[in-house]
């Protein structure tokens, strides 16, 4: 594991001061009432396993700008941050209720594409996703 100060963050992710401490942030519209600083919004490592991994210095396979297939998007909190610093982001979720929230999150993100599909059955959504996905989360 790498010390936080040595961590190379994906392009489009920065450390910014929120509530008196340095935390991860992405540029984008607020989704869940998270603290903001101008265009930047806090990415809470206590609410997002992916943010916790990045915060801990683990390699997550995201550099910024890539095409992402995000499996298990739920209501869209973490995937909204991913879409803020990535290219096309396909968010797969099988439960209709969270997908309603996910669709609302996608309204402010032109590169976020919610898919009401079962992630275990890629043949049902492969025709929608770009052929060359750079990362699967």
Where are these regions (language model features)?
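Conserved S-adenosyl-L-methionine
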Residues: 82-90, 110
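N-terminal auxiliary segments of SAM/dcSAM-dependent transferases
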Residues: 1-40
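Signal for well-folded cores of large energy- and translation-related assemblies
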Residues: 55-59, 83, 103, 107
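Conserved class I S-adenosyl-L-methionine
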Residues: 62-76, 88-90
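S-adenosyl-L-methionine
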Residues: 92-137
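Conserved alpha-helix/loop element of class I SAM-dependent methyltransferases that forms part
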Residues: 8-15, 44-67
């Amino acid at each position: 594991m790498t010390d936080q100060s040595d961590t190379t963050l994906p392009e489009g992710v920065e450390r910014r001061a929120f509530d008196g401490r340095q935390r991860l942030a992405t540029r984008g519209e607020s989704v869940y009432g998270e603290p903001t600083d101008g265009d930047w919004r806090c990415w809470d490592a206590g609410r997002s396993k992916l943010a916790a991994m990045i915060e801990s210095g683990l390699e997550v396979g995201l550099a910024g700008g890539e095409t992402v297939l995000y499996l298990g998007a739920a209501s869209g909190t973490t995937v909204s941050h991913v879409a803020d610093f990535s290219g096309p982001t396909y968010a797969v979720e099988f439960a209709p209720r969270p997908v309603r929230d996910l669709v609302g999150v996608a309204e402010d993100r032109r590169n976020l594409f919610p898919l009401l599909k079962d992630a275990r059955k890629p043949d049902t959504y492969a025709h929608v996703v770009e052929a060359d996905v750079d990362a699967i989360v």
